Regions:
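Short, well-ordered coil/turn residues at beta-beta hairpins
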Residues: 120-121, 144
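Hydrophobic/small residue at the entry helix of a nucleotide-binding pocket
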Residues: 33-34
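Glycine-rich phosphate-binding loop and adjoining beta1-alpha1-beta2 segment
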Residues: 46, 51-89
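Conserved SAM/SAH-binding loop
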Residues: 98-106
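Glycine-rich phosphate/adenylate-binding loop
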Residues: 2, 109-116, 126, 136, ...
Length: 252
């Protein structure tokens, strides 16, 4: 019967679509990368999603985040994303977690219940812990490397973490994961040399923070504020979603 996933089924087949509908994917970080990942996952037929993020939509998110509009500023990102998911597929099961994933909060999550984990967070400590937990649970995970300060969406590619180069975040991850005995990790990274942001205090979030009241992470507390565009993190998110869908559907 013709349905909203019929065009996708033409490529994957009925059996694969049923598998996607029964798959549960956890996406950590619902920002510029994670938001587009979730968008593509639900539109591709993933039936169960866990959204993890404690941040609220900020005016400065409008330049790149799919959930950011004037009407959503000040709302929790996971709540906005959940509403969007259910508007696309009312049958989807969505669990929201308003928390920032760190080693201290890991006990709140049972990774064994996930079929796939997406790491779309920025903090190295959180990324490492996510990888460790997923590997221990035997759950596939894909991790986003640096998407900030980049201008070339065509420079991103999928690779094992130990085959990456150029990306500063990937370099740190290689070192830290090697220390912990992690042998491999699928990542999306860029071979583009990062662009140095213009130092202009008038447009710096560090000196002119406009985060909504109650926002979890004040820009004034951040060491660096990376530059961003609409056409880079979105591409990273879509690449990640493609890898998740193809892996779960057995299309490799």
């Amino acid at each position: 019967m013709l349905n909203q996933f019929s065009r996708t089924e033409l490529l994957f087949g009925k059996e694969a679509m049923e598998k996607l509908a029964n798959s549960r994917v956890a996406v950590f970080g619902i920002g510029g990368v994670g938001g587009y990942t979730v968008e593509a996952l639900v539109r591709s037929g993933i039936g169960k999603l866990d959204l993890i993020d404690d941040d609220k939509v900020c005016l400065t998110n409008l330049n790149r985040q799919i959930i950011a509009t004037r009407s959503t500023v000040g709302k929790y990102k996971v709540d906005v994303m959940k509403d969007r998911i259910l508007d696309i597929n009312p049958k989807a099961e969505v669990n929201v977690h308003k928390c920032f994933y760190l080693p201290e909060t890991r006990d709140e999550f049972d990774f064994s219940q996930y079929d796939y984990v997406v790491d779309a967070v920025d903090t190295v400590t959180a990324k490492i812990q996510l990888v460790m937990e997923a590997k221990e649970a035997g759950v596939p995970i894909i991790s986003s490397m640096g998407a900030g300060n980049k201008l070339d969406p065509t420079a991103f590619q999928v690779a094992d973490i130990y085959k990456t180069s150029v990306c500063p975040l990937a370099k740190v991850m290689r070192r830290e994961l090697k220390k912990r005995g992690i042998k491999k990790l699928k990542v999306v990274y860029s071979q583009e040399t990062p662009t140095r942001p213009i130092e202009d205090m008038a447009i710096s979030c560090r000196t002119n923070c406009i985060c909504p009241p109650g926002a979890a992470h004040k820009c004034t507390e951040r060491r660096d504020i990376p530059g961003s565009t609409a056409f880079v993190p979105s591409v990273v998110g879509l690449i990640i979603a493609g890898e998740v869908i193809k892996d779960l559907a057995g299309k490799k």
